[in-house]
Every structure is written in C-alpha cells, then in structure tokens.
C-alpha cells in the first residue's frame, strides 16, 4: 500500500499510471484482481472512529473539583440523615432534602454534559454524507452502471458524467467531451468550477489546486464527461485525510479561557474549604471529647460523644455547602444562552455555548477571503475600449457589488444611444454566455459561472442601444417571487436580436469560448470572450468608438496591454471581448445539418476559427470586498486584535483585496506580510514564529488545509486565542483546531458547520467583530455575577465559621444555604448578565489569558463584605437570644426568653444547669402558632432557634439583594450607575424576595426549610441590619478609584 500512496499519479502519463496500477482502459480490472486488492486496501469508505462509551462520558462529567466536593457533601449528608443523627434539623423527608437537591443538580449537569459530548463529532458524520453511493465501472470488459462506491479498489476504471459525485480520488485518463469542469470548492476553497484534463502535471510536490488531472472524492462534475483511473480509496483519499485531521484536531481541543479560570478557582477553593472545614471541626473538639490530666501530661478518663462529634462534622459539611457556589454553573449557562440570543440577532449563530465567552478574548482572527471579506458575488467593476483612435482608451467604472441588476450602475453613463463599440460589448457579454440570475432568500444568486452572471448584470446596467426602445422593456425588469429566475430584459433583447446557432466551448489551450450568432442582417458573426492576453494575441483589428475598424499595431497593443496591466494590479480578473464577421465556411451555418458541422465537433479546430479577430474591449471583474469590512478591520485594530487572511486565491488578488479593505496601507512593504502557503511552510520554524508574532496584518495565499492547520497550531502555541473562519470541507480540521471555529451559513458546507463553534448567517466578517464585542460584554457581565456570587459565599462561610468559633447553635442549616445559593442568588446573578456594555469595549486590548478573575484588591473587598455578611447574620441570631431591643425596636414582643451570651456559648451544657434554667413558650405568625418547651427547656437552643434562624436567613437574603446592586459596576458608584440602568436586576430582586416570602409563609415549605413567618417589626429590623452593605461597598469603590488614579499618575511620571 505504501507504494501506491507515494505514487504521484498526477505527475505521470496515463500509460505509466495504467502500468503502475496494472489495469487496462478497455477492460478494467478482473474479478480476481478486485478480490486481491480488496484484501489489501479494504473497502472504499471512511473509517468509523471509536467513540467514548456512554458510561465513560457520564464519569467524565464528575471529574471536576467542585463536583467532587458536592458529591462528598451530598454523601455525608445522606449518611447522617439516614442514621437520624441530624441535630435539630427535623427528620423524615426534610432530612433528605439537602442531599437530594445536590444530587439532582449534579445529575442535570451530567445529562447536559453527556448530550454536548455525544453531539461533538457530528462533523465526521456530515463528512460521510458527502460520499458517493454508486459508480459506473468497467470490470472484466463489462460496464457495471451502478456498482456500490464502497466496492471500488485502486486501478478500477470509472466513467464520470455531468452531475456525478466523484466516488474516489482518481486520475483522469481521457475526456469524452471537449471540456470537463469539476466543482471542488468545498475541498479546495476555489470559488469556481475547475477545468480538468488528462495531461500530466510536471510537479511531484503539487498543491491540491494544481492537480488539474485529478478528481477528488466528494466533488461534483458540473460539465462534461471523462474516464478515470482510481488511485486512492477510503481513508487514503483527500476527504479521508480531512476526516483523520478532524479527529486529531478534536483530540487537541483545549479548554476555554473561562473554564481554565473556573478550574483554577475550583482548585484553590477546594484547598481553602478543606482547611476551613477541618479548622471549624477542630475548634469545637472540646464539645465532643474531654479528658483529665494526671502527672502534668497523662490524659485519663477520656470521654467521647459520637452525637456531638457528628453534629460538628455536620457543621463542617454545611460550611462546604456554603462555600461552593452551586448556582454558578446554571447562571453561567443562562448568561451564555442569553448571549447567544443577542448574537443571533446580529447574524452570529452560536453552536457551542462556551465559545460565546471565548470570543471576548480573541487575539487573532484568521479569515478566509471569498465570501467573508468579499461578497462572494462576482461583479464587473470597470471596462475599457479604444476611443476615437488607437492610442486612447475609454474607461467606464461600474458600481454595485451583487447580482442585483438594480444594484448600482455605470458611473457617469451618458450613453443613452450606445455607439457601435459599446453595442458590441453588450452583445458579446449577453450572448456569449450561459449563466443566469435567480432570486432566493432575499439574495440574488448566479446560475452557471459567476463571471458570466456578472457580465449579464453589466449588460442590464448598460441598457439597450436605443433610448426609445428602453421604455418597452422597463416593466419586465422587475424580478419575480422568491426562488424564481430574474428577468434580465436587456440580455433577452440582445438574444432575440441575434440568435445563437452554435457554441465553441472553452478549453484551457486557447483560454476562450465563443458562439456563432445570426445577425439581423442575415449574416453570421462569431462572438468571443476569454483571457485578455489570449484574445489580444489572436486579434488583427480593433474597433474604435464610432464602429470603424483599424489594424492593431505594436503601439495600440502596448496601450491595451498597459491598461490591462493596471486592471490586474487591482486584483481584477480581466476578460477580453472580440468578434469576427468573416467566417468563411461558417458564414451561412444555421444547424447541425450544415456540412461544416463536423468541424465544430472537434475542439482542436476551434483555435483556427478564432483567428483574425476584431478586438472590442476588456472587462475587469472581481469578487468585491464588503463595504463594511474596512470599518470592521479598523475596529479590530483598535481592539488589539490582529487579522490574518488565509485564502486559496492567487497572491496578487489577495494582496489587492487586503489593501482595499485597509488591512495594509497603500504603500506598505508586503515582503514580510504576504506569503503563499508553500513559501511560508518552506521557512524554518523559528522564522515562521517570528513572522506570526509580529504586529500588523498578514495574508497567506494559495493556502491548503494543512497550511491553515499549521498556522492555527503555531498561533495557539504562542498563547494566542485564535478565531478561524471557513466554509469548505477542507477548512473543517482548522475550524476544529481553532479556539473559535466560525463557519459560513450561506456558502458553508455541512461538514464545516458541524466542525465549527459559530455560524455566520450572513457570511460577513463584520459580524465576527460584532460577536467579539458581544463576547467581551458577556465576559464583563459574567465577571460581575461571579464576583457577586463568590462574595455572597464568602459571607456564608464567615457566618458558619463565626458560629463554630463562638460555640453558639448553628444559625443556618445546609438546606437553607443551598436554597440561597441556588434559588435566591440565581435571578440577580442572571440579571447582571444584562448589564449594558461599556462604550469603549472595543477600544481596549483583549484580556490576557492569565488575567485573574479575582485580584488582590477584589479579594480584600470580598473579605470586607463577607465579614459584614457573617457578622450581620450571626449578630441578628445573637441579638434575638440576648437583647430585648435593637435601635429602639423591641425584639421580645413574641414573649421569648432572654439568655446571657455566656449561656448561649455554652448551650450544649444546658442539661447541667438544672432547674435554674427555664424557657417560656413564644409565638410566631402573629400568634397563630406557639413554640413550647414543656418537656425539655434545653430544646430552646434546638427546636426554639427556628425564629432567630429565620432572621439570620432573611438577613442573608436581604444583604445579597443589596449586594447585587453593588455588582452593577465594579468601580462606579450607584450615584453614577443607578439601578434603573439595568431594570432586569430590579425585577430579579423582586422575584428573589418573592421566592423567599413563599418559603416563609407557605407552611409546608417553611417546615422543609426549618423557618417560620416574620412580623412587620422583624422585617424592619432585617432591613436595618442589611442596608449598610451598600454603604460599605460604596466606601470600598471610592478607595479603589483613588487607588487606580494614584497608580495611573505614578505610571505617567515614570
């Protein structure tokens, strides 16, 4: 197999290829040959990569630090609930609420993760759909018209016809028609169908585009028919190599910047949680283990209380629950989903949620040219003819960049009655042409060759020769309904005037095509269009503006060639136009019955017919840049994002477009910025890295898939965050490898779309820039709500730590903390995702990959705010037990018993207090319920703590609502960034308070969460205790602003 794999079939003659593959054109392979080769090469099908089993995918979802901590907390909570060891937290169903909710969250998270993973490799499935199902094959001297394509082997002789999908990589052995065109844009990125022939290509190391005698699996024959020799099948085909590259790229997929930050944060949080949990448990060791000491150091009479040990262990578990922001994954997912909706409104369809955030830190955009930077609609931008004499030219500029006949026109067109020369231009462009235009999906599209469609649109902009006749065709220029052909009235007028009687098809030798038409005067005329140099070389005369003919001499040829050179330097594709009236034996040709018809069946005779031509003019066409791309390139430059254009087009065209879109300045030296793919790859690795690391734009032309992948891989190794655009099958590996793969929605193949992270509905580069801006805004908002949620959790941790350190009863139980983290915090955190974007968001450089979510100053703020949260929640608990009033507001209106702070600290020793301690019943819910302690006064510190625990929980909720207002802006005061700037946040706060009231005032839920209703007086106390968090953070923001101003001044003076 190695021998065939290394055999460059394109660089060898057909006879040598037949000898190499041991086959014959007249008989094909024998059945015995097929069997032997089948055993050696296998079937012609793409390999099925082994996917991960379901159980493996499920386990992977739990391979996360935070998830492992939650699993541990859930397991311990379940065991303690099952053993009935929960101290003062109820029994039965209520005891299992906490582990049940945690496990439910983890299961939902795993389901989403498995679903995303199982859909990740759809690109490979889409690739398989491109494969051909059957082929017309010659074996044992017999034609098999519908042999299953999977049964092909190297050496098979296959016939291809118009519309056939190529079943394998094959060497063209001969054409059965004058020309053969294959649509291979999905594989190579070439915009137009490619001419194929049987002549060898004298290059062993040849680009895919240069293999003009090869047809590739998955491409389609659009014109002509041929006979081919199968050279590669299955995974050895070009499409097979792409599948292998997609698979390898998927293995190289790295985590998104945010995922890395969250993992890093998770690891640090794990360490902190373990330390604090152990510390909390150890602080209270005297409450569950005691001993006497003899001889100064020997412990005796050791007493151990398993009940109290598990109780304080439960507190440690509660601390873990408090420290972990359980609602964070859900809020992040919600924020990203909201971001996708915003992007969809801007024509950016996000397929993978994490890519929304990754867009925000993009540092390099690698963009294709065709269809992304350009319109992917060929248009004539200028044409020239000779003037009144052979030494002058007339140049006409044409506006409009689409196939819409009414898009633009000919600039300063004063030819209401066209002269003979311009009439010849219009006649050739409209009749020597097989293309058309149709209207679909609010877009004008071409049928046939794009260049020919552009010529027909040019004719519509020119109008018809006589002004008086234009009134008769004006009404029919309106296009029909969606999906139908567009009526090209001017072209129809020319086609009715001059009837086409024969076509001389294009071939690559003469580089032209022509038609014989019957003119109104009864004479035949040959209309020719083709490569401008080739047309000029075969022209003997030229037509002047008045229609007169003059012989072409050297000076007039120089004038034409100079103008042609100017046009090509602008990146225009130039087509020469000519005609011929003296047709000899074809002067009266009218049908296939004509005696000279045999000559028209022989393409080798066409070049003799197309001689002594009359030169008419040259039309310059191009795929024009989108109008908005130049502005988008400048936005990228302002935002610190580098743009690199990677295209399959030739170097001069690519450079011209890049200069026009202002990627390069007009007189910029491009020697270090513009390379062909082959030139770049031939450089040493160190030199390539140096080129890629330099600032400014880059353009890589004639780039192959492997070149794109290598450029992306090198950029990623340099620490860049790379966005890559593509539309073809050949782009799929690079799309998969890039941090952000962006496929084209209009021109993109299904393979490219499935391999991408995002699809552009309008194929427009400026949409990428808008998406980057949205990604940056989303990241800033995510940072706001992450900081908000973490600061809330720090407060919860400090609250539990203070409870344990002071030795008082726990003021909140795990299920309450879980409710706060998941439900109460959720709406405000999500609403912070709606914060308006900063005005200068695209004036700042991309954030660095090592940019911290939490820097030292933010950490100090967390600790200060968290400390207040802890003091407030524990303080209200202590106040209820020990104080009769707070700021003049009575706390004992419910009739509860006051105790000293010392008693509260030593509540676990209550049983030893004897009859000295009694607890009177107190009322809740406006006197509708009484909590009594008749059997055991010590229950006052367990069952009786339901009211102070409710106060602590409500203070925590209220503080976190006020703290969400602080998160509106990282540095700006609420005076400059008022809450109504984000009305969704006010709605979310209302929802969270409403949810809290539901669990307070619905008896069943109140029992589940171990709380009771509060009175109006108690709510007033809650607000008084909670509101200062806003004043504290305002002071911290002021200090932060002063600190930043001081740093800026210091930098300026350095």
UniProtKB/Swiss-Prot annotation:
Mg(2+) binds at residues 727, 731. One of its GO terms (cellular component) is membrane. It is found in: Membrane. The active site is at 368 (4-aspartylphosphate intermediate). It is an enzyme of class 7 (translocase). One of its GO terms (molecular function) is P-type calcium transporter activity. The chain crosses the membrane at residues 54-74, 99-118, 263-282, 313-330, 783-802, 813-833, 854-876, 950-969, 983-1001, 1017-1037. Its EC number is 7.2.2.10. Residues 1-53, 119-262, 331-782, 834-853, 970-982, 1038-1054 are cytoplasmic. Ca(2+) 1 binds at residues 793, 796, 824-825, 960. Residues 75-98, 283-312, 803-812, 877-949, 1002-1016 are lumenal. One of its GO terms (biological process) is calcium ion transport. SUPFAM superfamilies: Calcium ATPase, transduction domain A (SSF81653), Calcium ATPase, transmembrane domain M (SSF81665), HAD-like (SSF56784), Metal cation-transporting ATPase, ATP-binding domain N (SSF81660). Its main location: membrane. Ca(2+) 2 binds at residues 321-322, 324, 326, 821, 825. Keywords: ATP-binding, Calcium, Calcium transport, Ion transport, Magnesium, Membrane, Metal-binding, Nucleotide-binding, Translocase, Transmembrane, Transmembrane helix, Transport. It catalyses: Ca(2+)(in) + ATP + H2O = Ca(2+)(out) + ADP + phosphate + H(+). It is a multi-pass membrane protein. Belongs to the cation transport ATPase (P-type) (TC 3.A.3) family. Type IIA subfamily. This is Calcium-transporting ATPase 2, endoplasmic reticulum-type. It comes from Arabidopsis thaliana (Mouse-ear cress).
